[in-house]
Amino acid sequence: MSGSLYRSPSAALYKSPSMSAFGGLPAAFGSMSVADLGSLTRLEDKIRLLQEDLESARELRNRIERERADLSVQLIALTDRLEDAEGTTDSQIESNRKREAELQKLRKLLEESQLENEDAMNILRKKHQDACLDYAEQIEQLQKKNSKIDRERQRLQHEVIELTATIDQLKKDKHLAEKAAERFEAQTVELSNKVEDLNRHVNDLAQQRQRLQAENNDLLKEIHDQKVQLDNLQHVKYQLAQQLEEARRRLEDAERERSQLQAQLHQVQLELDSVRTALDEESAARAEAEHKLALANTEITQWKSKFDAEVALHHEEVEDLRKKMLQKQAEYEEQIEIMLQKISQLEKAKSRLQSEVEVLIVDLEKAQNTIAILERAKEQLEKTVNELKVRIDELTVELEAAQREARAALAELQKLKNLYEKAVEQKEALARENKKLQDDLHEAKEALADANRKLHELDLENARLAGEIRELQTALKESEAARRDAENRAQRALAELQQLRIEMERRLQEKEEEMEALRKNMQFEIDRLTAALADAEARMKAEISRLKKKYQAEIAELEMTVDNLNRANIEAQKTIKKQSEQLKILQASLEDTQRQLQQTLDQYALAQRKVSALSAELEECKVALDNAIRARKQAEIDLEEANGRITDLVSVNNNLTAIKNKLETELSTAQADLDEATKELHAADERANRALADAARAVEQLHEEQEHSMKIDALRKSLEEQVKQLQVQFRKLKRRLLGGKRVIAKLETRIRDLETALDEETRRHKETQGALRKKDRRIKEVQMQVDEEHKMFVMAQDTADRLLEKLNIQKRQLGEAESLTMANLRVRRYQRELEDAEGRADQAESSLHLIRAKHRHQLLRAKMLQRQKFTFSKMSNRDN
């Protein structure tokens, strides 16, 4: 009975709190405060004190039981001795007295032990009541905490729901990250293709560079040749300029001489007019003189004799006239010689000018040839320059594109390096985390196996406890039956010993009342404890079912979380493998891109050097082109000057032809005059012959002048043809210039198209940069998500650790509960043994009462016998 007394508080202490704690397992130990731990320590201290009290009570009861057993043995022996010593003597009566004294001592000892037991029971009741109050308070606190734990559990359930939502979101983000990784792989493939295209483009640029270098060398050679030709042309130009200056000076001298000759010719014409008038006068005079000569001849014939003196006088006059005529003829001859000298000088100047004109024509032809060559070279140079410009523009565009791509590649490389470093760090962190996860997973699996094993053990323990509860119920029923039997026996013993107790009622009335009160209290306690036990059993069953359900739910949740963690771990391992493979691929592609970038950088440096060399060569070509353009302009200016000079020469030639015509007319008139003079002046035959010779020479000179004029006409015609050819070539040059302008316009349109394409490429580049920024942001978001996943994993790890700690605490509590159940079982066993001992004590008391009654009866009989003997002795003495 008293075992149930000691069972219910421990059950209330260790069953309900632990069960409530197990009910709120995911949250109770997660939110258990220091006060709860303090209360648990206080409860453990109280339990320890109660256990010590129980042990002391056990020791006392054991000692009492031993003493009772000894006393029962002694009583049995005494009863046997009393039965054997019933017909003994006074010595036996003395021994009976001694035995009664011993029995009194034993009764005192029994009473003292009963008092000690009652004191211990009162102390235990007080302690039990205090413990019950403490347990009630603690139960209330634990109920409050249980409500808090339920709220916390609900909150944790919400958090679990949120965590599942976040896990789903993380799965979605992971799927998106995988898609992004696939896009990154596609972009890496595109980048590798672009890098290959860049390599091919760089190879093409290298080939174009080699070709351009060869063309540049050829152009340098051509430019060198052109420079040499330009130097020669400049030298020829300088010589031509000098010759033209000399020709200009000569022309100016010739013009001055021509003006002088014109003035002299005018004077000669005036003189010829005067000579004509003089010749007319002389012819008239000659005619008159001939007439007079005829008259004179007639008169001479008539008057020869008469006028010999007059003839002499007239001969002197004729001589004077002849002298005068000879003087005039000499003057005329001198003037003609001067004219012939002037004509010879003019012929020399004409021949010199003709030779100069021929030289100029030859030089002009050479200049035209050189101009044609230079024009062809200029066209080639313009073509090459245009091609070089186009190539330079293309190269500059390609160079800018390559620079942009190189910068973009460098930026991509830097980003890839950063991403690679981050990925390496993430890989290392993920490897460490994976190792930790594997270890934690292994530990969690072991803990889960332990938890499953412990759960199985708990199920077995629950089954065992249920069996023990059933056994306790049966034991309780048996104890109740034994109590009823004991009560029945006690009633029968009371009925049998009612007569014997009449004498002991006064002494034992208080004890009986106390025992009755104690029995009532014990009955009340037993009823209360049975009710509490029933309630505790019901609560325990409900709690066990609830705990079982909760454990099953928690085990299912733990299994789900473990499965989720396993799946997450497997997915993380897969993602780690994928990321490691992607990292390897990215590392290989990064190395390839680094090599290609190094090659592109080397090629870029070579291209820069080539571009600098080409730019220098282009500058030289531009300088040469400018020089050629200036030379062309100078040649055009020289051509215009030559055309002007040719026109001047043509005008001079026309003037000379006019002068020649005038001279021919004048010579014809002079020849007519000379013919008339020869007709008129037979006397001046020598002068006439001389004049004829001079006229013949003049005619020859005239023929020569005619031939020279014919040559000049031919030269003029050839010069006109050359001028026409030059005009045709000039028109061709204009057309070519127009064609060049059209080509330049086409090139400008091409440049505009290229600029638009460049703008489009820059826009695309900006778009790609924006996409790369978006991808960087997405990578950062994925990194943040990975960090959050890592944090969630750390939190899950912490929760797993807390669960393991809770499982350990539960295990410890289960061990403590097992120890308490064992202690309760021991207490129950001790209580049963105590009850049995009490029953045996009651039986011993009843037997003792019987023995006392028998002993009293025997004493009375002995006294009566002694009295009878004494009376008999007195009577015998009296009789004696």
Curated annotation (Swiss-Prot):
It is found in: Cytoplasm, Myofibril. Residues 35-859 form a coiled coil. Keywords: Coiled coil, Cytoplasm, Motor protein, Muscle protein, Myosin, Thick filament. It comes from the Eukaryota. Residues 1-34, 860-880 are annotated as: Nonhelical region. Pfam families: Myosin_tail_1. Its main location: cytoplasm. InterPro entries: Myosin_tail (IPR002928), XRCC4-like_C (IPR014751). GO terms for cellular component: bicellular tight junction; myofibril; myosin complex; myosin filament. Homodimer. PANTHER family: CINGULIN-LIKE PROTEIN 1-RELATED, MYOSIN-6-LIKE. Belongs to the paramyosin family. Paramyosin is a major structural component of many thick filaments isolated from invertebrate muscles. This is Paramyosin.
